[in-house]
Amino acid sequence: MSKFSFNIHHQHKKARSGIIVTAHGEMRTPAFMPVGTRGTVKAMLPESVAETGADILLGNTYHLMLQPTAERIVQLGGLHKFMNWDKPILTDSGGFQVMSLSKLCKITEEGVSFSSHINGDKYMLTPERSTEIQYLLGSTITMAFDECTPYPATFEEAKTSMQLTTRWANRSRNTFVKREGYAQFGIIQGSVYEELREQSAKDLVELDFDGYAIGGLAVGEGQELMFKVLDYAPDFLPQNKPRYLMGVGKPADIIGAVSRGIDMFDCVIPTRSGRNGQAFTKYGTVNIRNSKYADDNKPLEHDCLCPACRNYSKAYLHHLVRIGEILGSMLMTWHNLTYFQNLMSRIRAYIKLGKDFDFDS
């Protein structure tokens, strides 16, 4: 079994491209991770996700602990076997979903107590329990438990939240079972305050995580402020470890973040947009519901090799989406995921050539 490692092969200014080696295979960076929240990428077969070029996908601890439960998944052979995906899986810690989806959520030093959004059952999620669940799932990359600082937050609110995340990170690290080829990432917080981001990074680097995520962005602060934070936050992290920007997935945001030193991304945008009839292309987005596509016999993108573009016209996709056929969601999602993997491939090629990005979609 391979050791977990990150090898930077090319660098252009702050942008890096390379390979992350894991127990479940290699992933090329910069990488975009499709979101498979409940053990599935919506409207896609796992084999189809691999065909789009994805090297890794994301699963969600909160949703999987509720249904079908981590204990059931481990009895069935782990998440990889359960969903027939043999490549790397990163699982988030569950904290963000607990705080955003659950009613009567209460945050204490111990962890977060909450009621299930499904049936109202009460649960307690702690750094130890979150790490244990991710171990049971067999996650290739486990995320430390954190509090995603709401935006906007005052300096003092952000400081208190960041310090709690640091204490939780310590407990997560102490609970993590080290195995060859598996990894645990810490999450730095601090909202939009440089001093807090620097302190958070310093504290977490001392815990020697295998990689680091920048959390608490794309929560309403806007691109300009997000880029301002990314102008300095990645520089506080080790050069030789992966950097993951959580929940960011607009093409222009990805391109801007890569140019500031980020290696990994995840977002529901390509899948959610696909189900809602929006396609991403190199020439901008296409709302396939628009009546102007009813008689358009051309593909979404003439040089895209996804099944939607190889085999079907915009008129057919328009028809499927307008009448609510499942095939419409499948084809639009497949196209969007292919577009995002093509975008990452383009980004990696530009870094290898030492070229500035001259595109934003």
Swiss-Prot record:
Q: A Gene Ontology CC term for this entry?
A: cytoplasm
Pathway connected to this protein:
tRNA modification; tRNA-queuosine biosynthesis
UniProtKB keywords? Glycosyltransferase, Metal-binding, Queuosine biosynthesis, Transferase, tRNA processing, Zinc
The record lists the catalysed reaction(s) as: 7-aminomethyl-7-carbaguanine + guanosine(34) in tRNA = 7-aminomethyl-7-carbaguanosine(34) in tRNA + guanine
Kindly give the InterPro entries that the UniProt entry links to this protein.
ArchSynthase1/Queuine_TRR, TGT, TGT-like_sf, tRNA_ribo_trans-like
Top EC group = transferase
Q: Which residues form the active site?
A: 92 (proton acceptor), 266 (nucleophile)
Molecular-function GO terms, alphabetical: metal ion binding; tRNA-guanosine(34) queuine transglycosylase activity
**Residues reported in the UniProt entry to bind substrate:** 92-96, 146, 189, 216
GO aspect biological process, one term? tRNA-guanine transglycosylation
Residues engaged in binding Zn(2+):
304, 306, 309, 335
What cofactor is this protein dependent on? Zn(2+)
Manner of cofactor binding, per the entry note: Binds 1 zinc ion per subunit.
Region: RNA binding; residue ranges are: 247-253, 271-275
Q: What is its EC number?
A: 2.4.2.29
HAMAP family named among the record's database cross-references: Q_tRNA_Tgt
What is this protein's function per UniProt? Answer: Catalyzes the base-exchange of a guanine (G) residue with the queuine precursor 7-aminomethyl-7-deazaguanine (PreQ1) at position 34 (anticodon wobble position) in tRNAs with GU(N) anticodons (tRNA-Asp, -Asn, -His and -Tyr). Catalysis occurs through a double-displacement mechanism. The nucleophile active site attacks the C1' of nucleotide 34 to detach the guanine base from the RNA, forming a covalent enzyme-RNA intermediate. The proton acceptor active site deprotonates the incoming PreQ1, allowing a nucleophilic attack on the C1' of the ribose to form the product.
Q: How does it assemble?
A: Homodimer. Within each dimer, one monomer is responsible for RNA recognition and catalysis, while the other monomer binds to the replacement base PreQ1.
Return the similarity comment.
Belongs to the queuine tRNA-ribosyltransferase family.
Protein name, UniProt field: Queuine tRNA-ribosyltransferase
